[in-house]
Amino acid sequence: MPPNTPDASDARPPQADTETHSHSESENPVIESPKPKAHAPLTNQDWWPDQVDVSRLHKQPIEGNPLGAGFNYAEEFQKLDVEALRADMLELMTSSQDWWPRDYGTYAGLFIRMSWHAAGTYRIFDGRGGAGQGAQRFAPINSWPDNVSLDKARRLLWPIKQKYGNKISWADLIIFAGNVALESAGFKTFGFAFGRQDIWEPEEILWGQEDTWLGTDKRYGGTNDSTNRELANPYGATTMGLIYVNPEGPEGKPDPLAAAHDIRETFGRMAMNDEETAALIVGGHTLGKTHGPGPGDLVGPEPEAAPIEQQGLGWKCAFGSGKGSDTITSGLEVVWTTTPTKWSNSYLEILYGYEWELTKSPGDAWQFEAKDAEAIIPDPFGGPPRKPTMLVTDISMRVDPIYGPITRRWLEHPEELNEAFAKAWYKLLHRDMGPISRYLGPWIPEPQLWQDPVPDVDHPLVDEQDIAALKEKLLDSGLSVQQLVKTAWSAAASFRGTDKRGGANGGRLRLQPQRNWEVNEPSELDKALPVLERIAQDFNASASDGKKISLADLIVLGGSAAIEKAARDGGYEVKVHFVAGRTDASQENTDVDSFAVLEPRADGFRNFVRPGDKAPLEQLLVDKAYFLNLTAPEMTVLVGGLRALNTNHGGSKHGVFTANPGALSNDFFVNLLDMSTEWKPSETAENVYEGRDRRTGQTRWTATANDLVFGSNSVLRAVAEVYAQEDNKAKMIEDFVAAWVKVMNNDRFDLD
């Protein structure tokens, strides 16, 4: 091997004559992409595309779950012999199947890619994607061009799933396979947790506005400058149908420095910093190979477009045998190391041990080959050895001014790479699972900062007598019903059901960055939080038997007490269910940058939107309800109740359709549906509507789209009518309380 060279700046190739195929794609740069076809008959959404789609609040209905409403995965998992499962996985790793032969005598590389591509869809801006629900089994992810051949990987797992049945979910099995694959190669992983529950139909996620695979124009606003462009939110990939980036470079232009720009942005949107990103690429490419021995036009349609007789398998290949050495997965033909089945530092030794020149794979895809190199790379099926090769994105790890110093350090200190990759891999596989309280199994390591850790309960909890006394103190504290309700909502409404982050547990409303979020009205928190802290301190100092109440619990209890009072003021007696057990996190255990992405752009429940945001308010309201795991009726009754309670952001009166603000009632619905009121856009205020008496023209109310959507949208109006009925006044109160408790407890996974 030639001696290490200090620089690889010549790895940036000339840009002339390097245009790739217009249909080029990662893990499939030469396979023609499918063309979406108009369907018939048209749906309501096709006819009225601007109408808010409430149906997204009712995805994954229990009726579609063959295991039924009573199935408890955590309980079923306890019956699993995890060591036996691991042993069977290790045996499978080296048990070649004639219908899909293993490379180098192992499926490790294939399983690592499967797990990575399942987890790698996660994105931080909205918490969508990830491996937590086994979504790789369904469209569109199962047919993305980046996932060619992963249908075979999942099919290889079927005998394992069939054997262990309900004790292991597909979501867990897909991820566990990659972890075991690394261990089979001699790598010591950081840990592993089970606990992912399967979904039973595709998720409705906006992966991009482009209508063809590999499109990039919509997410970048049409710019062609690959070194100075900004990916639109919330997308996590540069290209439609890819997990991260095109390995040939942006839009198939083989420029390692431009590729590094894309890598940094996309991995950052998966919550990975530069060192974690470099570790994942270096470690992930230490094992296995890519597949591109022939032209991509010999590869058939993806699973969702494949004929019925292929039984869910796609990409049938007509090149040679179509499998083994004739497998076409990416069009790229790269083996990174001399030890593709064993963990080693060979990747970095080869990356820095040669100069690299641009070439084309047998599948006509851009890649790099080592200059003046001997054929030292083993063939996966016993053929002649090969020269070292790398992807465009591999060269990025050397020439980029940030990644370069990191990987050079690891070249000299491989033990640092081992630790960095172990932790980054663990984070990749578990980032979307939420708090560690959701984790199952015997291999769970100590909590990490990115898991938003909260302390364990280390004291006796308050009982019913304590709760009653604390409610009295809260109502006598000088804080209004509105202050108590708004503080509790601010704490709990940070929750995201997508990646199970946020919520009231941890009491992080008092910490940065949440304390200064505009939506939380920091000046109001400065009034409310010190009062609540004093009540908690006084109780904890005087309570017997070591009982304590956390500020997180007291904030929620304050909301409960306020709602009970508001219901009494409206003529109804209710009890708001409360279960203590939350604890208070510290600022040092709160990653400010990580929490920043949880800050809402809008919260229609508080009639708040960031100034200048042009998105339709009613769409943002439904999105917020989706994050809070709410149904359409729950969203409806919460908005109506919160308006009656007069808890809008900044004290706004928009939507407060009642003569008795602060009392819990169904007045919002009664007055919204009153046909003696005529609504028109305000001539003086943006995004505001005025409700005028049809006879006199006098202004009765003001509202935003967050309010009027419940009279405009036919689905939501149907629900609003129920709550406006004379015989459903009490039902409205009861349903509001139930929905409120659901929001307060969204992050109480210990109660499940």
Swiss-Prot record:
Quaternary assembly: Homodimer or homotetramer.
Required cofactor names: heme b
This protein's name: Catalase-peroxidase 1
GO molecular function: catalase activity; heme binding; metal ion binding
Listed Gene3D superfamilies: 1.10.520.10, Peroxidase, domain 2
Residues in cross-link Tryptophyl-tyrosyl-methioninium (Trp-Tyr) (with M-270): 116-244
Catalytically driven reaction(s): H2O2 + AH2 = A + 2 H2O; 2 H2O2 = O2 + 2 H2O
Keywords, in A-Z order: Heme, Hydrogen peroxide, Iron, Metal-binding, Oxidoreductase, Peroxidase
The enzyme's E.C. designation: 1.11.1.21
Cofactor binding note: Binds 1 heme b (iron(II)-protoporphyrin IX) group per dimer.
Gene name in the database record: katG1
Site positions per UniProt: Transition state stabilizer: 113
Catalytic residues in the record: 117
Function: Bifunctional enzyme with both catalase and broad-spectrum peroxidase activity. May play a role in the intracellular survival of mycobacteria.
